[in-house]
From Swiss-Prot:
Assembly, per entry: May associate with the eukaryotic translation initiation factor 3 (eIF-3) complex.
Subcellular location: Cytoplasm
Xref: CDD domains: CLU-central (cd15466)
Protein name: Clustered mitochondria protein homolog
Composition bias type Basic and acidic residues, residue spans: 729-763
Protein task: mRNA-binding protein involved in proper cytoplasmic distribution of mitochondria.
Any single biological process term in GO: intracellular distribution of mitochondria
Polar residues composition bias: residue spans: 1241-1253
Lineage: superkingdom: Eukaryota
Coiled-coil blocks: none
Gene (UniProt): CLU1
One matching Pfam family: CLU_N
Species this chain originates from: Meyerozyma guilliermondii (strain ATCC 6260 / CBS 566 / DSM 6381 / JCM 1539 / NBRC 10279 / NRRL Y-324)
Molecular function via GO: mRNA binding
């Protein structure tokens, strides 16, 4: 974004004129005695005003009203999208402090009653309970943040001292946290999977509310104003029949068997349904108040329980069944009546028309862009939700296809304006490139192209709302179809139907169409994708006369609405030809599954950037040389550089069996090699010093951002191993060179005379005293956990390959399994894969009532055993990732970690319990899960009066997993939702202001941005979470420690709910939040957050994550500063033990921990132990860095001085304990005491300096710096 644009965004946001609007409520509304006052921008619309009013507590029940200015009905006179400024101008509102408006009751219609009843359900809290009832899994959006019970963030005052004295209670709390951190037996899944679900504590304030059996209203009563009849049962068990009238609500005289719509005089009518129920049930208002109190007390952050508006919550892979609660509600099955409108058509949407209409909205001003982006994100969210629910029903077999006579994979559906297909090779387009596997891959790449088009926002060309749903092993592609594409054209019997494709490859694949209107509209997209206009020659000899902008496989279709649509964007990046030529051999059994392997958009963008930069640099040098020659000749014209787009673009149809220029092929080959030769090499190199990924999802995310496809996971693992071996060899050579240098120094020291040594020491002392003012030379040590990082990346890559291979195996079995047999298969497969220590041939028992409906071929999984499953995984990994798993790989991976990874990949929710994977642990697990089933024996008719005898049967599991352990399967949804470009522009403007030292303006923009994020995405959304994380970092850098802590806490809550309670985003946010809490001197809070992060690491990765070493060491130093020395020493010891395990005992990082630990021990006057650690550090530093490095010299000095000091103290103690003699010979003072006292004094001086000399830190910080996602 240019500087002018940045200034424009700031001006647009800061210069909005605010209008104070005073609202007078109807007299019968609670709180109507005082007018309401709200602040609105002049650019806000009437719709914005009504939305704002709906958020006010006093307006929460009022849904049906007119807005009046004096006697002018604004609601009827002006459009709801009319800006307030136009209303003020049109009505000639007098200039006064407030614009005075009045709300008046509007007569109800049946549609308004439906809306009012829906609002009533929301007000009394039923929407919380409805959300749980209609979820596609269990306990979505739960978290653990509130379980930490953090104290309130203190206000940090400027004059507050940095030193904080903790009370004994706080020290005891921190000590107990440290004990839990150091507890090696803390891996307990039965506790790890427990959550507090706020909604489970809420009580329904009424017993039931249903549409009465007397509905619909008869024409006779409708004439009198009756709209609907309801039946209400209160908590007092009283039943009321209620009439919804145009004037409001009242109790009628109906009963269950008699119809009498007359009003009961004993009950007053009310305009608001809430007021009527409150008058009928005293417990109603009390229950609502109690529910509100529960929500308020459960968390200080409303983000913990607010319902996500534009996204879905994350489903946990572990589910505590005790937290699952079901609240009865007879009106819930009738919600479709209320939501679908009077004629049932409100839920039927023309998604495509709505989507395109929003894209056509004006976007000239900031407010217009905010409105447009908000509506677009909202619509995409609603589309994805609707599509996901329908896709799940399709997979479960609940819906009838349009083509029921074809195979299941070929079935297509058209439901509620959305077209559904199975993402298979239905048209035969991928017959030669992999069939169904290629079609499945292409569906995901098409979606990636749609997401990019959403951001590009090209004019004159349209694309489709799209999402992809994976559920129980099947994929459903959901799209809002092009208008008219499903209509069959009317043709004569002897004529072929007209092709609906106007641009690109024809439906039958025999020709390529061109169209000037499409071509011009597609040019901006081609430029954004860096595609080269090109001609196409098909294998059948057909040649295009004109260039086409995109790949020939991307089709242009003109809809019946007159809009031009582009579809099939799966080839918007070039083929990965290097990978294809090496691994696509369809005639071989070990061939890669398909040939549709394309590069990622991130890789193309990076290739384009580097190539353009190289061309620009070359041209600059050439023009500068020419300019220099012209200056000599007297010419001074400034050169201009124009970048030829042809030099930095590619032909997307290269290597697609079409005839293409060799030059175009070479460019695509260069791009393919760019990934393997540069991006992967750079990724492995950066992995040495960057924060190591936390889990497979984190690794996958990093690879995608780097432009690396996951098919290269095998190459990543291989290169990590090779890089590790090279590093170890380099270290070995360095050690040999340093050891030679040490030996040479020792020889030189032996040849020196004692007098020369003392003279040299005096000279060095004087030199040191002279050089005190000189800056200290930094150490050459490298304290990145290179060995641990490379090992971890390799392990994570292998784990990710295994988990993804298992997902593909599940998918292959799921095609023949019904939904009710899938839990048995998944549980059995897990027993075979992870339970070999319990049984290599696990048993499986399936209910006969289920097997009776199953195809015998579908039950082939029953015979699987451990060795077969291991072989299947090895073959799948080799097939998809070109990597041979090492021997005994199953023993190298953590069962819990693998169970979690597979659960995330396939969408499995397991019952929370202490799964055990060893023979010893399984025996305890068996006992803890024993169930006693009571069977009652049948009694004869003669003995009916006698009680039937019962028989107890003990169910004892024989395997780790059983089908009942699977709580649910959840869908994995790939949406076309995107990051609004406006937000990036405002953020860059704010960052520019801060960088330019305009702190106040920058912070104001950031605060405005918080509001805009919540407007566009809603409060509970991954993008909002990410921005909170970035904002907390900015606040911290600006010195706003209190604000940083508050915002970081919200980021933790939101990431837990949207990304997962143990996702890498959540763990990172906890680490950052802990850092900010410590910076704010809230050490108890910081340690609670660190404990949660470290605990998650243990489950997600294992206790040996490279960053755990840094975290433990930093915590130890914090404890040392807080004078909690015993726990500090234990954490230092734990960090040392872990570092020796993952970095090596003889490594720079381990030596640095010795160095820091020694400094802490000196502070505790534990000189003997400190000496031992300094000696170890000195040995390692001299061997790995340099004998003359600053750290090596420092350690040498500390060792020498500590030895001298310890010897002196021992001598002092010895002299003190000597018995006094009567006579002592006179001793010359200078002959015996001066030298020893000087040495002791020097040693004490050096030791006192050591207290301040433990500031060297690892370059790989345990704190994760949040960054905005690259798009």
């Amino acid at each position: 974004m240019t500087e002018d644009n940045a200034e424009g965004q700031e001006t647009a946001l800061s210069s909005q004129n605010l209008v104070s609007v005073e609202i007078t409520l109807p007299k019968d509304v609670s709180g109507a005695s005082k007018p309401l006052t709200v602040k609105m921008a002049e650019s806000d619309t009437i719709s914005d005003l009504t939305s704002t009013l709906g958020l006010l507590s006093s307006m929460r029940d009022l849904t049906n009203y007119y807005v009046f200015y004096r006697n002018t009905n604004i609601s009827e006179t002006f459009d709801e999208l009319c800006p307030i400024s136009e209303v003020i101008s049109a009505l000639r509102v007098e200039s006064q402090p407030n614009v005075k408006l009045e709300l008046r009751h509007k007569p109800y219609t049946l549609a308004a009653v439906y809306e009012h009843l829906n609002k009533f359900r929301e007000v009394i809290g039923l929407h919380f309970i409805d959300r749980r009832a209609f979820e596609l899994g269990e306990l979505s959006g739960v978290g653990k943040f509130d379980q930490l019970q953090l104290s309130q963030v203190p206000d940090q005052k400027e004059d507050e001292k940095e030193k904080v004295d903790l009370g004994e209670d706080d020290k005891a709390s921190i000590s107990s946290i440290c004990d839990r951190i150091l507890d090696e037996t803390k891996l307990d899944l039965s506790e790890y999977g427990k959550f507090y679900d706020i909604y489970s504590d809420l009580q329904v304030p009424i017993k039931s509310l249903t549409i009465s059996q007397w509905s619909p209203v008869s024409p006779k009563e409708a004439v009198r104003g009756d709209l609907l009849y309801l039946t209400l049962q209160t908590l007092e068990n009283d039943t009321y029949h209620i009439t919804c009238h145009l004037s409001g609500f009242f109790v009628n005289s109906c009963s269950t068997v008699n119809f009498n719509p007359a009003r009961k005089p004993s009950h007053e009518p009310k305009f608001l349904f809430f007021d009527l129920v409150s008058s009928l049930s005293p417990a109603f208002a009390k229950t609502i108040a109690r529910n509100e109190e529960i929500l308020a007390n459960s968390s200080r952050y409303a983000e913990s329980y607010l319902i996500p508006s534009h996204t879905s919550g994350s489903y946990p892979w572990l589910v505590d069944t005790s937290a699952i609660s079901r609240k009865p509600d007879q009106s819930r099955p009738q919600l479709s009546i209320l939501n679908n409108g009077v004629d049932g058509s409100d839920n039927v949407k023309d998604w495509n028309e709505d989507f395109q209409a929003i894209r056509e909205l004006p976007s000239g001003t900031v407010n217009e862009r905010i409105l447009r982006e908000r509506l677009a994100i909202k619509l995409v969210s609603e589309f994805t939700k609707q599509a996901t629910e329908t896709a799940v029903n399709i997979i479960k077999g609940n819906l009838t296809p349009m083509n029921p006579n074809e195979s299941v994979e070929q079935h297509i559906y058209m439901r509620n304006g959305i077209f559904y297909s199975s993402g298979v090779n239905a048209t035969g387009a991928f017959d030669e490139t992999g069939g169904n596997e290629a079609a499945r891959y292409a569906a995901a790449k098409d979606l990636a192209g749609v997401k990019l088009l959403n951001r590009i926002d090209a004019k004159g060309i349209y694309h489709l709302a799209t999402c992809v749903v994976d559920y129980m092993g099947r994929r459903i592609v959901c799209q809002a179809p092009v208008p008219g594409i499903l209509n069959d054209p009317i043709v004569e019997s002897d004529e072929a139907p007209a092709d609906k494709v106007c641009y690109g490859l024809s439906t039958d694949g025999t020709k390529v169409y061109s169209d000037s209107q499409f071509h011009e509209a597609l040019k901006p997209i081609a430029e954004a994708f860096h595609m080269k206009p090109h001609k196409v020659t098909l294998p059948n000899g057909f040649k295009t006369k004109e260039d086409i902008a995109l790949s020939k496989d991307s089709k242009g279709i003109r809809g019946t609405d007159g809009r031009n649509y582009v579809i099939d964007l799966y080839r918007s990046t070039p083929l990965d030809i290097d990978f294809i030529e090496k691994h696509w051999r369809p005639e071989h059994s070990d061939s890669y599954p398909h040939r549709e392997t394309v590069l990622r958009h991130e890789a193309v963008e990076e290739w384009w950037r580097r190539r353009a930069l190289a061309i620009f640099k070359s041209e600059t040098e050439r023009l500068e040389a020419e300019q220099g020659a012209k200056k000599n000749e007297g010419e001074s014209e400034k050169p201009q550089i124009l970048l030829d787009a042809q030099k930095v673009s590619f032909n997307p149809d290269a290597f697609t069996h079409d005839e293409v220029d060799e030059e175009d092929k070479e460019v695509v080959r260069e791009m393919s090699l760019f990934v393997t030769k540069q991006l992967i090499e750079e990724f492995v190199e950066e992995s040495k010093k960057q924060l190591c990924p936390f889990d497979g999802s984190h690794l996958s995310s990093l690879l995608h951002k780097a432009g690396i496809n996951l098919r290269y996971l095998g190459l990543i693992a291989t290169r990590a191993q090779e890089s590790l071996e090279a590093f170890e060899q380099e270290e070995k050579s360095k050690i040999e060179d340093n050891e030679k240098a040490i030996e040479e120094e020792k020889k030189e020291e032996k040849t020196e005379k004692k007098e020369e040594k003392e003279e040299k020491a005096d000279e060095e002392k004087s030199e040191n005293e002279e050089d005190k003012t000189k800056p200290e030379e930094p150490s050459k040590g490298v304290f990145d956990p290179i060995k641990a990082n490379l090992n971890s990346v390799r392990l994570l890559a292998i784990q990710e390959m295994i988990a993804r291979a298992v997902k593909h195996i599940f998918r292959s079995f799921a095609h023949t399994l019904s939904s009710y047999l899938l839990p048995y298969f998944v549980a059995h497969f897990h027993n075979c894969l992870l339970g070999s220590q319990v049984s290599s041939k696990p048993e499986i028992s399936i209910d006969e009532t289920l097997t009776a409906f199953a195809d015998p071929d579908a039950l082939r999984f029953i015979t699987l055993d451990h060795q077969q499953v291991v072989s299947m995984v090895e073959e799948e990994v080799l097939l998809r990732f070109r990597f041979e798993l090492p021997e005994n790989w199953i023993n190298a991976v953590s069962p819990i970690t693998m169970m979690r990874e597979i659960s995330h990949k396939f969408g499995i929710q397991w019952k929370t319990q202490g799964y055990a994977f060893t023979a010893e642990g399984f025996k305890e697990f068996q006992q803890s899960t024993e169930n006693i089933i009571v069977h009652k024996q049948k009694s004869s008719k003669k003995s009916k009066k006698r009680s039937s005898p019962s028989v107890e049967e003990v169910f004892k599991r024989k395997t780790i997993f059983v089908a009942d352990d699977i709580i649910s399967f959840t869908p994995s949804v790939k949406s076309s939702s995107y990051k609004a470009t406006l937000l990036d522009e405002i953020f860059e403007a704010a960052r520019g202001k801060i960088a330019a030292e305009e702190k106040d303006s920058g912070v104001t923009l950031l605060n405005e941005l918080v509001s805009i994020y919540e407007q566009i995405y809603g409060v509970v959304h991954p993008e909002t979470s990410n921005f909170y994380s970035v904002l907390s970092q900015f606040y911290s850098d600006l010195g706003f420690t209190t604000e940083a802590s508050e915002v970081a806490r919200k980021a933790c809550v939101l990431f837990e709910r949207t990304a997962g309670f143990d996702s890498f985003e959540t763990i990172s946010s906890y680490i950052n939040s802990a850092y900010f809490e410590a910076a704010n001197s809230s050490y108890v809070n910081a340690f609670k957050l660190y404990e949660k992060a470290l605990g998650d690491w243990d489950f997600v990765f294992g206790s040996h994550h490279p960053s755990s070493v840094t975290t433990l060491t930093n915590l130890a130093e914090i404890l040392a500063q807080l004078k909690i020395t015993d726990k500090a020493n234990r954490l230092f010891s734990a960090a040392l033990e872990l570092s020796e395990k993952i970095n090596g005992e003889d490594s720079q990082i381990t030596a640095m921990i010795h160095y820091r630990f020694a400094g802490t021990l000196v502070n505790e006057n534990r000189f003997d132990e400190a000496l031992g650690h300094f000696e170890k550090a000195h040995t390692t530093f001299s061997r790995h860095i340099d004998p003359n490095d600053r750290l090596t010299k420092d350690c040498s000095n500390y060792v020498a001085n500590l030895k001298t000091y310890i010897a002196y103290m021992k001598q002092q103690a010895k002299d003190k304990n000597k018995p006094k003699k009567v006579k002592a010979p006179p001793v010359p003072p200078q002959a015996t005491t001066k030298k020893s006292k000087n040495k002791s004094k020097m040693a004490q001086t050096q030791i006192s300096k050591l207290h301040l000399n433990s500031s060297t830190r690892f370059s790989s910080s345990s704190r994760v710096k949040p960054r905005l996602k690259k798009k």
